[in-house]
């Protein structure tokens, strides 16, 4: 034994003499750090675009996005291990590089962050490692110390990458899935130099009470008397604790000591420390120094109860997230990973599921530093890896990521892609022994079932296990996500065993097709599931989620000249006294104007409100002409939580109708009413407005007002679902219009308190009569009365106007996004305007959408090629329909009736890809109309 120690000491001395060896870990990138700074390598692709010749490619990258190979989406080959027509090209990479001469005498490791899918690596003509790595999302490391040159001696790396794995089960697990399949060296490649005697890796467990333990794994055994010095450094660089642990002659050492009063890590308070490990020999000489960031926090999974972090029950407000960008596929950069985390947090989320594979290290670093809880997943979309390959991939995932305090869960595949033999492998490598989830299954104390209806969700929450759906409210096109979230969240938060859930999903997975003139392709309804578009274009649900999941819940009550705000704290760890609140009293523009006046602004004192409690804050002495008051909450990091707008009074005063002098004339087909410079044309066949002439110009508002009503076609008007209807399945996206069976009676003039009134009367039908008072301000007050008894999803009155002539709209009401009956939260009361657009869901992303249903409207003005059409709500008229929302090309969600410009009492709810509309909760239910309604608006034409 003494001879061994003497030999070891002699070897250390020789190495020290032969090179100026740094004690720090050093890294040299052979590729770029990500998609923003790729490095050119020599490259040849065997098939598809630009194949069969040597050229260059940026590394890291997905080669399809660099113009090589064949694009492919996994679902086309779902469930088939070796299908015909699968893109199976290979890529051959070569790159020459040099390493510093002073690195000689170090251990040299070659590191690939991820290669998709099989990788065979050579360094200087010799095989690296075992010659083959399989699995496209994992870091793998080869010791190439005996294969490398230093100084002026060139090194050559060669990599053969197979897009399709030689192992069909790897393809089933990772590539026969509902996402894009790529090929290439998709994450960075670098060389690491460490002293021969080094700390290979550390596994940390730091608890809320300050106990710090770490397993330090050494590159080789060290003679007795060696030590590891551990220093805990805070974010300001101050050493707050230290410890020296003996190395007892083997290759693993346990560090165990206590740190007094550490600042704890949570998603709300992401306090990080750095552990500095210094390896010393028995003379005290420093051999190697390694650094690792971590956080002090304790996770408890309490059976039949919930998840506790640092002793407090936590609710996960989460989303599923792919590593993805349209121009670079799975290859990202540090900046883009940070951008993703900031986007998620901007919606007041606190959690993310890495669907369906481990993310870049930079993403997890951002979750650690900015604050997100993470569920990190082993690949296996609907089929699992074999045990042998799975064991290797679990090891690679867990050993790389286990020290991230943000990781709260591991998951072993997705929706049946489970290899239960791997369950114990996670604990084998994870010092913190986190729970392993099985998304879509009930296992290890968690019920995670996906896409249950609102009613089924109630049933699942009656089970004893912790309920936490790892996917819910599927967000295809403009459905799901925010639509139904408030209903779901209310029942979930009233169940003590619910731990929250994860929406599907963050962003539309649309890829730039270099083979199709650079269009952004979401593959129809497969990839267009995001809360935001491919370039993070915000859809309406973004703002709904932001409001429903706000950690400050606000309700406002206007009390004379004051507003009383009830502030409820739904944080887990933050007191509202650490937030800031500001307000603005606004005078919104009157009908047809655009100036917003700020009458008063200032700060509200942040109340002392602990998590779970509420308090009332009063804003006093609102200026008399205030239309709306905005309240903005800013969190303890300086980020805006939410801005709420409270309507104080209508922006356009509602005056009594005062008739002006009118003159009339007739043709064979029309009654003409001239009021000032405007002439109104009414059909003698049906009494409907046909057009308006303004100073010689025609404004083509026509065919109204007419009664409109529609119901989903898969049920009758008495709310009965016809199970005998074989076409019911396809009808679930269709709407049946109610046809008013009334007959036109005639037009007469009445003398009313307001003056001369034109009445258009109908017999036997739903619409009873329409009255017109032509007013002195140039507008006409229209009062329509109808009576309908039945179940409807849409109901009101409507006009036609050529959509091709519309240029823009402005309004005071909720905005700037449209609403659905089950997605009313998010848009705020204010003055809004936008130009005409007509985006195709999943194919174009121009938001906010021009068309759709708009709530709490005081007035709206359409600017057209012919002039301006104004609508001022007087009674039962605050929902304005502007044509009808467009569905995606596959018509998965709805085929709504054409209602032109409409004034609606009932607006539709929207379904999601999985659940039909009425399965999404109480707010998605149809309306049962049982009495007469009177709609009053002022119309103005300029």
Model-derived regions, located:
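Extended carbohydrate-recognition surfaces in non-catalytic/accessory domains of CAZymes
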Residues: 20-111, 132, 165-178, 182-185, ...
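Accessory beta-strand-rich segments of carbohydrate-active enzymes
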Residues: 23-27, 44-48, 88-199, 235, ...
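An acidic-aromatic loop/edge-strand motif
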Residues: 25, 62-65, 70, 74-79, ...
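Substrate-binding clefts and catalytic carboxylate motifs of secreted carbohydrate-active enzymes
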Residues: 33-52, 57-59, 63-66, 88, ...
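Beta-strand/loop-rich accessory regions of lumenal/periplasmic or secreted enzymes
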Residues: 65, 114, 163, 266, ...
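Active-site-adjacent substrate/metal-binding segments within catalytic domains
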Residues: 66-123, 128-135, 192-205, 213, ...
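Beta-strand-rich binding/interaction modules
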Residues: 121-123, 211-246, 253-255, 275, ...
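Substrate-binding/catalytic cleft of secreted carbohydrate-active enzymes
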Residues: 341-344, 351-540
């Amino acid at each position: 034994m003494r001879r061994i120690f003497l030999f070891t000491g002699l070897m250390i001395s020789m190495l020290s003499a032969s090179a100026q060896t740094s004690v720090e870990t050093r890294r040299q990138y052979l590729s770029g750090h990500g998609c923003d700074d790729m490095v050119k390598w020599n490259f040849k692709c065997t098939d598809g675009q630009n194949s069969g010749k040597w050229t260059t490619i940026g590394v890291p990258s997905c080669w399809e996005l660099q113009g090589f190979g064949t694009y492919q989406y996994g679902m086309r080959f779902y469930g088939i291990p070796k299908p015909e027509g699968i893109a199976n090209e290979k890529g051959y990479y070569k790159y020459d590089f040099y390493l510093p001469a002073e690195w000689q005498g170090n251990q040299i490791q070659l590191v690939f962050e991820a290669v998709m899918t099989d990788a065979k690596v050579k360094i200087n003509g010799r095989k690296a490692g075992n010659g083959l790595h399989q699995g496209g999302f994992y870091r793998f490391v080869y010791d190439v110390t005996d294969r490398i040159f230093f100084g002026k001696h060139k090194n050559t790396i060669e990599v053969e990458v197979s897009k399709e794995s030689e192992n069909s089960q790897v393809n089933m697990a990772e590539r026969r899935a509902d996402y894009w399949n790529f090929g290439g060296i998709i994450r960075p490649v670098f060389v690491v130099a460490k002293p021969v005697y080094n700390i290979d890796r550390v596994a940390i467990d730091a608890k809320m009470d300050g106990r710090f333990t770490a397993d330090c794994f050494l590159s080789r055994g060290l003679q007795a008397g060696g030590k590891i010095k551990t220093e805990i450094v805070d974010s300001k660089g101050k050493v707050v604790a230290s410890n020296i642990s003996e190395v007892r002659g083997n290759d693993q050492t346990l560090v165990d000591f206590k740190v007094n009063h550490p600042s704890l890590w949570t998603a709300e308070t992401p306090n990080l420390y750095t552990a500095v490990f210094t390896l010393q020999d028995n003379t005290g000489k420093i051999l190697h120094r390694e650094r690792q960031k971590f956080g002090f926090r304790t996770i408890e999974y309490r059976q039949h109860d919930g998840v506790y972090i640092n002793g407090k029950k936590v609710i996960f407000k989460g989303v599923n997230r792919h590593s993805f960008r349209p121009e670079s596929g799975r290859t990202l950069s540090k900046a883009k990973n940070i951008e993703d985390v900031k986007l998620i947090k901007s919606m007041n989320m606190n959690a993310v599921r890495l669907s369906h594979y481990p993310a870049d290290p930079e993403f997890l670093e951002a979750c650690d530093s900015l604050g997100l809880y993470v569920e990190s997943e082993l690949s296996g979309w609907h089929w699992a890896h074999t045990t042998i390959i799975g064991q290797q991939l679990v090891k690679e995932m867990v050993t790389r990521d286990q020290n991230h305090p943000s990781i709260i869960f591991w998951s072993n595949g997705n929706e049946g892609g489970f290899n239960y033999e791997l369950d114990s492998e996670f604990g084998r490598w994870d010092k913190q022994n986190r729970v392993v989830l099985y998304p879509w299954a009930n296992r290890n104390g968690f019920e995670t079932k996906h896409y249950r209806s609102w009613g089924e969700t109630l049933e699942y929450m009656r089970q004893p296990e912790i309920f936490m759906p790892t996917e819910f409210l599927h967000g295809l096109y403009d459905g799901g996500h925010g639509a139904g979230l408030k209903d779901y969240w209310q029942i979930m938060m009233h169940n003590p065993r619910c731990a929250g859930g994860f929406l599907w999903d963050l962003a539309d997975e649309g890829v730039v097709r270099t083979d199709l003139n650079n269009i952004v392709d979401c593959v129809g309804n497969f990839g267009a599931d995001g809360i935001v578009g491919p370039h993070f274009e915000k859809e309406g649900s973004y703002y709904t989620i932001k409001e429903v999941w706000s950690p400050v819940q606000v309700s406002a009550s206007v009390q004379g000249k004051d507003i009383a705000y009830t502030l409820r704290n739904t944080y887990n760890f933050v007191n509202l006294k650490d937030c800031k609140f500001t307000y603005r009293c606004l005078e919104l523009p009157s009908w047809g104007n655009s100036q917003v006046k700020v009458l008063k602004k200032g700060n509200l004192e942040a109340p002392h409100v602990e998590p779970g409690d509420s308090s009332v804050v009063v804003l006093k002495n609102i200026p008399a002409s205030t239309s709306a008051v905005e309240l903005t909450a800013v969190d303890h990091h300086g980020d805006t939580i939410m801005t709420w707008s409270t309507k104080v009074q209508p922006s356009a005063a509602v005056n009594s109708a005062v008739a002006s002098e009118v003159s009339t004339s007739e043709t064979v087909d029309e009654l003409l009413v001239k009021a000032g410079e405007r002439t109104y044309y009414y059909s003698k066949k049906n009494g409907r407005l046909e057009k308006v002439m303004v100073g010689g110009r025609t404004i083509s508002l026509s065919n109204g007002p007419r009664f409109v009503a529609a119901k989903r076609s898969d049920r009758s008007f008495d709310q009965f679902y016809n199970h005998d209807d074989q076409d019911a399945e396809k009808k679930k996206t269709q709407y049946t219009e109610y046809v008013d069976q009334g007959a036109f009676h005639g037009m007469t003039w009445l003398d009313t308190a307001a003056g001369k009134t034109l009445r258009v009367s109908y017999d036997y039908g739903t619409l009873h009569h329409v009255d017109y008072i032509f007013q002195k301000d140039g507008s006409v007050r229209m009062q329509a009365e109808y009576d309908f008894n039945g179940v409807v999803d849409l109901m009101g009155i409507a006009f036609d106007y050529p959509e091709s002539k519309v240029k823009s709209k402005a309004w005071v009401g909720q905005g700037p996004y449209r609403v659905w009956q089950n997605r009313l939260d998010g848009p705020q009361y204010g003055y809004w305007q936008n130009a005409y657009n007509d985006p195709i869901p999943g194919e174009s992303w121009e938001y906010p959408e021009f068309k759709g249903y708009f709530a709490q409207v005081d007035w709206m003005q359409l600017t057209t090629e012919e002039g301006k059409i104004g609508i001022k709500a007087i009674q039962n008229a605050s929902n304005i329909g502007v044509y009808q929302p467009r569905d995606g090309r596959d018509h998965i969600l709805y085929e709504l009736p054409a209602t032109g410009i409409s004034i609606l009492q009932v607006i539709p709810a929207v379904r999601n890809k999985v659940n039909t509309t009425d399965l999404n909760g109480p707010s998605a239910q149809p309306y049962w109309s049982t009495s007469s309604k009177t709609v009053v608006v002022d119309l103005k034409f300029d």
